[in-house]
């Protein structure tokens, strides 16, 4: 739920094999004995090592105390693991770039911002890759639709925008990212300390080596880029193998669908409807809420029936030559629970629609 990246296209089976950030054990793998309350580590990570980038960091020491007292972690092993974590200045810089700013003035008129954003995701090659993903995991997508009520195009749209259907899941060690942000980023240290706590619990429960798992610079994981807290609340074992693996596309499909259901997705309902007319005098955005009669009084009419909806948010998209207005319905708002952005939600929806259309052509 962070990041935007682009790569050249390769055959799907090559890409999915290459990008997996959760190594699979083989018959020749050996693991060391696991102390009570500890992790199942690979031999190269089971070292008697003290020091490291966070050795004298009081926040790190307080975190270790909490994990031992609250969750029963093995203190020595946890110290050894954190001593192998790296402080990543690049992560701190990227987070600063994500910070909200009030110094940039909004454009005085339309400049095509929506079109530029849309072109990052909705391209012929990307749509075709979405078709391949949908076809490969059609059974899981249809099952998620039946179980959670979320249609395949929404799940495909989310995974496409987040990771190009698994092609770009991040190359940063999650432990490094979350430790850096927990111990050296005061502005959001409390939040990321909670994410690190949940990440280590996940690794212990799933018997993963926490030093092996990779994701985004902010610690987002797998096909759907779940943060550890989202894993804890919404991730599911959709493949039925007894493990929750966000780097497994089937588990990711079920987890994304469960996330949407939990955030109010209404099965079979509309997402948004384009409007005729302009309403420059009304505040816009996915957080707004107007009665349909208010929008009509402002000069807007829906291009398609709105069903039984009596209220909508007013969405405005900058298309360069002017503004495009939309009625945002509750399912549109649900998409924004994944990423709080009108552009993001519209890109997810339209990408999924484009892939669905391409499958039948």
UniProtKB/Swiss-Prot annotation:
Its EC number is 4.2.2.n1. The keyword Signal applies. It is a lipid-anchor. Residues 1-18 form the signal peptide. A lipid is attached at residue 19 (S-diacylglycerol cysteine). The active site is at residue 162. Murein-degrading enzyme. Catalyzes the cleavage of the glycosidic bonds between N-acetylmuramic acid and N-acetylglucosamine residues in peptidoglycan. May play a role in recycling of muropeptides during cell elongation and/or cell division. Monomer. NCBIfam families: MltB, PRK10760.1. This is Membrane-bound lytic murein transglycosylase B. The lineage of its organism: Bacteria, Pseudomonadati, Pseudomonadota, Gammaproteobacteria, Enterobacterales.
